[in-house]
Amino acid sequence: MTQFDLLVRDVRVVRPDTDAVENVDIAVADGRIARLAPGIDVAEAADVFDGGGKLAFPGAIDTHQHWGIYNPLDVDTVSESRAAAQGGVTTGITYMRTGGYYLNRGGDYAEVFPEVLALSDGRAHVDYAFHLAPMQRSHIDEIGSLVDDFGVTSFKIFMFYGGHGLHGRSEDQAAFLMTPPGERYDYAHFEFVMRGLQKAREERPDIADRLSLSLHCETAEIMTAYTKIVEAGPLRGLEAYHESRPPHSEGLAITIASYLAHETALPTINLLHLSSRKALEAALIMAEAFPHIDFRREVTISHLLTDIDTAGIGAKVNPPIRPRDDVEGLWEHVLAGDVDWVVSDHACCRDEQKFGADRDNVFLAKSGFGGTEYLLSALVSEGHKRGLTDPQIARLTSWNPARRFGLGTKGTIAEGFDADIALVDPSATWTVHAEDSESSQEYSVLEGLELSAKVTDVFLRGH
């Protein structure tokens, strides 16, 4: 009888806690890493995989996905989790809320969330979890039960939803939000969400550090005003969308969110998809102003790889794709260690859904697109060019998100951890084509981009 279920031999193991990349074999038993050592006897394993000297990264943890936003959740869970695995992602955490899109219904999570779980159960090709957004007053009262009964540890606020639409200006956000009559989704609601989550943390000290709040930081009033100005002017495409949602809208929202966290004594705050120099600057200023708050800062791979001149309207997303100077600013902060994790913000939006009747009108297009299938390959490719080390990449894509979101057996390649492994050929040159993707989205905002690293093999708990 063999000691191990799987032996992945001849790989260069990348770990987040050491600068050394080790030439070792990885032995797996019962879905966990059982031994790391050079020259493990192949006779000890039931199955042997030759890694061919490739880099072995801990499986990426893509903590920002949107399964089911534009397509049925049961369908997206299958196709988009396959795309995730294609990108070296072994764990996806996807956002879910009530209101327009997703299940397209309001109500309490006690009724809605079991339906979400049933629709996704048994369909994913990767491990997964859900962040939940308290959209109405009753959801705040449910935070404790969502933690205790369903294991939810992460909650979200969309700061602009109360007064500005998902795709642009909106005259009736209440209908979109599907909240009870008389309720408002505003700063007061955000404060009460924070107080509700902090109460849950205080009542559960053993897991308090795993309970956090993520925020999409843009300011509705600024965006509505600027959208009217831009719509009346000559700008078109991604430049117009960028100008309609200016970077200082992010900075102001970050400032407000941070002070509310200070006021409510909620110390676990995640600032999502920061897209501009001003957003990162505001986030760092707030971290200095409120050192007792454990801020985590996120950027997306698309904001690191595209700008308003390299992509078309298919790249409409919130916050917007920015000019090249903002892209360079994001990279400066990534290299300086100011960013905690890199994600995809994957939201599969097929061509027939994405564009309006006038395909050239960015304000008629829907927001969001896919890209999880390129997460690790693209970050290794572009990161190596800019001096990002492999251990830094492992921290940005696996270790840091695992620690924040309480995934205690994930995040590194070490004995006792889940055997979630992504093999990367760091010298494979290839070109992005949407037709090669496992996603059901028919286009890619990275179409034609040449990458110099590629995920070749992925193991989820040793399979």
Name each model-derived stretch.
Residues 356-361, 415-463:
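C-terminal cap of metal-dependent C-N hydrolases
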Residues 1-57:
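Histidine-rich, glycine-flanked metal-binding segment
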